Amino acid sequence: MIRHNGENGSVVVSTGVYTEIAGTAAANCLSVKGMVARSVSDGVYHLLRRESMGKGVKVEFHEDDTISIDLHVMVGDGVNMNAVGNAIIDEVRYMVTSCTGTQVRAVNVYIDSISFG
């Protein structure tokens, strides 16, 4: 959680808010099929439903009130993965900063799976 203090009080933003914003921003990028999570039992990556997207996002809080975000995504075939990754980074950084006022130190994108067809 990050606390934003003002002269009239404070606002605390929970981890769930950051994961929802980041997951939604990433999933809405062109060529992203969705967020993925790795199954502990079989080691296979599974596409997450919209309501479970936070499982494909990890948020780390730093002492200087910045955050780092790790995203695990599935992309479509035939795309430039580097370009998609950079678009995700830009979109997630913008959305998190504009919605919460929190500075994003890093956005790390892991393309864990590809969807053919």
Locate the predicted segments by residue.
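Contiguous, often N-terminal, cationic amphipathic patches that form binding interfaces
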Residues: 1-77, 81, 86, 98, ...
